């Protein structure tokens, strides 16, 4: 591990090796070469003078990437794609002259971005499904455990611990729906040339538009992404990146809400997230048991939610058929959003699978608020069976509740709300009722 230069915490501390692999240099530049091979094969099939030997040579060198040579070429040429064209050509001297034939940089760059986002979305979906499974098991285990529900983080009415988990799960199911939509609608750029007109390929095929259309279809079939953009400039629309990161932002929102709930429940001592035997909560306060995993979820989620704005601004700032001010931003914003979301979901799964629930504390909190919660049923009963005026009884309950709460909060006394209502003649309740 290098210690003398900056290393991204997303890779060092948070994201899984699987997600890091998707956005690795090996995966990226191998995919470039796969695209160059698909282009050469398709051009050969449509009649261009490309030999089987040239294609075999390209395939044999697909993983033989001399990164030092590519770096040297790029320092001279100031162009990453051409640096790799030359590096690949040096490894395939017989095929060097037909590599990248008719293509522009975005043929490999943009198509690779779509392919990698597709793989990353599949990885994220698998994590979402694992999280939903964990929540489902948790919800079933605690479906019958009553707990105090909160609105405005003030005591409301009873729910169950399992029902509350269904709220978290429902958010993730919504995210899965959004992810599936984007995954099913991801489209390759295809091979449309420098401005999206396919001019270079029309030149190669002597103006045969049918062959140009077939070329794109063949490439898509070989790469395994069935759809291509019907219209583009030099790049695919950057709104596609925004749409994908909207999904990741949505997941981050769901996870952040979950983590906030766990942190609040932890403060109430109703649950604890997993805590290792030798884990330290505070360097100063040895007794502390902080919900640091949930806090980390919230922290990473904030990053992903904010990262969405990068893609929005990038999409809005593109000029005509293309401009390069998207490039540096995309290199950062898209992979890092996936890496952070991957980390968030792995933490989410870890927390819910190891969540410790304390039924005795939950019951204590519920019992303390039961008199207040009973008032809604009392109100309904008295209107229905006693002929009471709903508005007048509601006001009476409000006044009694304020006085009962004052006794609890100011003097530390027991909640006497039910006794106050029972002695109020306007309710007309008997002892047995």
Regions found by a protein language model. Give the residues of each.
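Catalytic-core signal marking the mid-to-C-terminal active-site face
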Residues: 2-25, 74, 280-433
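Glycine-rich anion/phosphate-binding loop at the beta-strand->alpha-helix junction
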Residues: 175, 179, 226, 234-327, ...
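Alpha-helix capping and helix-loop boundary segments enriched in small/acidic/polar residues
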Residues: 27, 108, 148, 152, ...
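A helix-coil-helix interface module used to build multimeric assemblies
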Residues: 1-199, 207-220, 281-282, 292-296, ...
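A short, charged helix-loop
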Residues: 214-234
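Short amphipathic alpha-helical segments with heptad-repeat character
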Residues: 118-125, 129, 136, 162, ...
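Generic, well-ordered alpha-helical scaffold segments in large soluble proteins
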Residues: 38-42, 87, 91, 134, ...
């Amino acid at each position: 591990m290098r210690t003398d230069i900056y290393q991204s915490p997303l890779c060092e501390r948070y994201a899984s090796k699987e997600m890091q692999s998707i956005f690795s240099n090996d995966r990226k530049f191998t995919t470039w070469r796969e695209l160059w091979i698909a282009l050469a094969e398709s051009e050969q099939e449509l009649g261009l003078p490309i030999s089987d030997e040239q294609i075999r040579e390209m395939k044999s060198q697909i993983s033989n990437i001399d990164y030092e040579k590519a770096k040297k070429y790029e320092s001279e040429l100031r162009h990453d794609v051409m640096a790799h064209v030359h590096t690949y050509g040096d490894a395939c001297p017989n095929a060097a002259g037909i590599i990248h034939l008719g293509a522009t940089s975005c043929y490999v760059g943009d198509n690779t971005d779509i392919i990698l986002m597709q793989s990353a979305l599949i990885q994220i979906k698998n994590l979402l499904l694992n999280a939903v499974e964990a929540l489902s098991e948790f919800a079933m285990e605690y479906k019958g455990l009553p707990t105090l529900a909160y609105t405005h983080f003030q005591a409301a009415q009873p729910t169950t611990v399992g029902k509350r988990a269904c709220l978290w799960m429902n958010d993730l199911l919504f995210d899965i729906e959004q992810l599936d939509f984007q995954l099913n609608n991801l489209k390759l750029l295809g091979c449309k040339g420098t401005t999206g007109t396919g001019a270079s390929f029309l030149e190669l095929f002597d103006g045969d538009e049918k062959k140009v259309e077939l070329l794109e279809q063949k490439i898509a079939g070989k790469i395994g992404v069935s759809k291509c953009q019907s219209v583009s400039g030099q790049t695919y629309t950057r709104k596609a990146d925004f749409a994908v990161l909207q999904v990741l932002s949505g997941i981050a929102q769901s996870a952040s809400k979950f983590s906030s709930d766990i942190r609040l429940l932890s403060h109430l001592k109703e649950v604890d997230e997993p805590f290792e035997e030798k884990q330290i909560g505070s360097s100063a306060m040895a007794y502390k048991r902080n919900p640091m995993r949930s806090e980390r979820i919230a922290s990473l989620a904030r990053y992903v939610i904010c990262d969405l704005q990068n893609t929005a601004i990038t999409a809005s700032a593109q000029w005509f058929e293309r401009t390069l001010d998207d490039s540096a931003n995309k290199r950062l914003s898209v992979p890092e959003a996936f890496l952070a979301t991957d980390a968030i979901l792995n933490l989410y799964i870890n927390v819910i699978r190891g969540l410790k629930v304390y039924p005795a504390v939950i019951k204590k909190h519920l019992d303390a608020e039961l008199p207040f919660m009973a008032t809604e049923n009392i109100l309904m009963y008295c209107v229905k069976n006693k002929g009471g005026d709903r508005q007048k009884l509601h006001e009476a309950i409000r006044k009694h509740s304020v006085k009962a709460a004052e006794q609890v909060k100011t003097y530390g006394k027991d909640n006497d709300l039910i006794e106050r209502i029972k002695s109020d003649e306007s309710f007309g309740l008997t002892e047995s009722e």
